[in-house]
Curated annotation (Swiss-Prot):
The active site is at E103. One of its GO terms (biological process) is pentose-phosphate shunt, non-oxidative branch. The keyword GTP-binding does not apply. The keyword Isomerase applies. Changing D81A: Catalytic efficiency decreases by 10,000-fold, with no measurable effect on affinity binding. Substrate binds at T28, G29, S30, T31, D81, G82, A83, D84, K94, G95, G96, G97, K121. Involved in the first step of the non-oxidative branch of the pentose phosphate pathway. It catalyzes the reversible conversion of ribose-5-phosphate to ribulose 5-phosphate. Can also act on D-ribose-5-diphosphate and D-ribose-5-triphosphate as substrate. The gene is rpiA. Belongs to the ribose 5-phosphate isomerase family. InterPro entries: NagB/RpiA_transferase-like (IPR037171), Ribose5P_isomerase_typA_subgr (IPR020672), Ribose5P_isomerase_type_A (IPR004788). It comes from Escherichia coli (strain K12). GO terms for molecular function: identical protein binding; protein homodimerization activity; ribose-5-phosphate isomerase activity. Changing K94A: Has a 1500-fold lower Catalytic efficiency than the wild-type, but affinity binding is increased by a factor of seven. Induction: Constitutively expressed. This is Ribose-5-phosphate isomerase A.
Length: 219
């Protein structure tokens, strides 16, 4: 199976967690896009979705799914999203698609976070994938200096502005042995909006696409 076929398999597998009559939290990226396609088959059974990016919002609306602003919603049963890396503790690096802040906000509200990914995203230690950090533009250089002190090599993601109007620093060369401590340390830097480490709030369920089928891991 190709990588895209594995992504499609987990996107459709996540449909089993969608309860009729609910509002579904939806992530961003190529794997989440397959979940949105699958969700389109249930558009008459769900109330709608909360989206983590403008791109996902457009796709949801194109399929006839009502998109709620998060401020209109009291609670979310599930949030379904991909990951750039996921470890054995269900902690993740996310933000390759630059939607990390909205993704983290929606994940924090959801009762259950379902991570959908192909097997290539599984790692023992997080950090080989460059760690995205969303930063207020005026603080870019100041934040970069602090990230160097934490052992990373920050690189400005040229030409990218987040949906919130901020910039992204991708931090290379990190071997993140204590993801919770690293998440807290980076989030404490003035000017950081959020870091793409999902360690304090990791996934509850991981659906991993393998050539032998979809593997389910429960926290």
């Amino acid at each position: 199976m190709t990588q895209d076929e594995l992504k499609k398999a987990v996107g459709w597998a996540a449909l089993q967690y969608v309860q009729p009559g609910t509002i579904v939290g939806v992530g961003t990226g190529s794997t989440a896009a397959h979940f949105i396609d699958a969700l389109g088959t249930m558009k008459g059974q769900i109330e709608g979705a909360v989206s983590s990016s403008d791109a996902s919002t457009e796709k949801l609306k194109s399929l006839g799914i009502h998109v709620f602003d998060l401020n209109e919603v009291d609670s979310l049963g599930i949030y379904v999203d991909g990951a750039d890396e996921i470890n054995g503790h269900m902690q993740m690096i996310k933000g390759g698609g630059a939607a990390l802040t909205r993704e983290k906000i929606i994940a924090s509200v959801a009762e259950k976070f379902i991570c959908i990914a192909d097997a290539s995203k599984q790692v023992d230690i997080l950090g080989k994938f460059p760690l995205p950090v969303e930063v207020i533009p005026m603080a870019r250089s100041a934040v970069a200096r602090q990230l160097v002190k934490l052992g990373g090599r920050p690189e400005y993601r040229q030409g990218v502005v987040t949906d919130n109007g901020n910039v992204i620093l991708d931090v290379h060369g990190m071997e993140i042995l204590d993801p919770i401590a690293m998440e807290n340390a980076i989030n404490a830097i003035p000017g950081v909006v959020t870091v793409g480490l999902f360690a304090n709030r990791g996934a509850d369920v991981a659906l991993i696409g393998t050539p032998d089928g979809v593997k389910t891991i429960v926290k």
